[in-house]
Amino acid sequence: MIDNTKIRSLLEEGLTAFQLDSIGDLLLDFLLLLNKWNKTYNLTAIRDIETMVSKHLFDSLAILPWIKGNHIIDVGTGPGLPGIPLAIAKPDLQFVLLDSNGKKISFLNEVKRQLNIKNIEPIQIRVENYHPNQGFDTVISRAFSSLEQMIKWTEHLVAQDGLWLAMKGRFPDTELVPIHQTYRVERYAVPGIEGERCCVLINNTNKE
């Protein structure tokens, strides 16, 4: 039995820290829908809905300060993380949510329909087969095992002056060694999560 009052309280506490108090209801609706679908379709390994608040919602929202531009793609979005929380927080930005898993894209289409989120476009395709008409201002992912792999598989998606934004746990010392583009690493804290979190911002400086 889910204690909605407790979940709402956890949400409100964290959203106050992010100065995003107004989006609590929509995030709660998303969380409840994710929890419901997860029981059947195994969309995320996290089963405890209270843990989802911090590890899914708050961890996603923590990278908001570093998003660049209006045209964003979340590669390997899974059940819409970080894309859905970001899209809810920034309804003026456009988000493409890319994943090759049909169950996850079906879930995202249901989220879009039920929650009436107009600024997302879920697309089922492998990243190497996706060739949009224009590059994205920010390419986000927490799905790749290394920064080098992220750049390799998504370099055709980023705009000439765009940005890669990779979500990491510990400071990725060894992953940064082969990176030739200019980058910076921002450490951040997430309400309810102990341990190191950081965001790697890599500028697309290799294109002519």
Curated annotation (Swiss-Prot):
What broad class describes the main subcellular location of this protein? cytoplasm
Q: What keywords were assigned to this record?
A: Cytoplasm, Methyltransferase, rRNA processing, S-adenosyl-L-methionine, Transferase
Residues engaged in binding S-adenosyl-L-methionine: G76, L81, V127, E128, R142
Q: Catalytic activity, per the record?
A: guanosine(527) in 16S rRNA + S-adenosyl-L-methionine = N(7)-methylguanosine(527) in 16S rRNA + S-adenosyl-L-homocysteine
Q: Does the keyword Methyltransferase feature in the UniProt annotation?
A: yes
Give one GO molecular function term.
rRNA (guanine-N7-)-methyltransferase activity
Gene3D superfamilies xrefs:
Vaccinia Virus protein VP39
Question: EC number(s) for this protein?
Answer: 2.1.1.170
Q: Which domain of life is it from?
A: Bacteria
- Enumerate the subcellular locations listed in this protein's record, separating them with semicolons: Cytoplasm
GO cellular component terms, alphabetically, are: cytosol
One Pfam match, given by its short name, reads: GidB
**Which PANTHER family does the UniProt entry name for this protein?**
S-ADENOSYL-L-METHIONINE-DEPENDENT METHYLTRANSFERASES SUPERFAMILY PROTEIN (PTHR31760:SF0)
NCBIfam families attached to this UniProt entry: rsmG_gidB
Q: Which family does it belong to?
A: Belongs to the methyltransferase superfamily. RNA methyltransferase RsmG family.
Function description? Specifically methylates the N7 position of guanine in position 527 of 16S rRNA.
How is this protein named in the record?
Answer: Ribosomal RNA small subunit methyltransferase G
Specify the species: Legionella pneumophila (strain Paris)
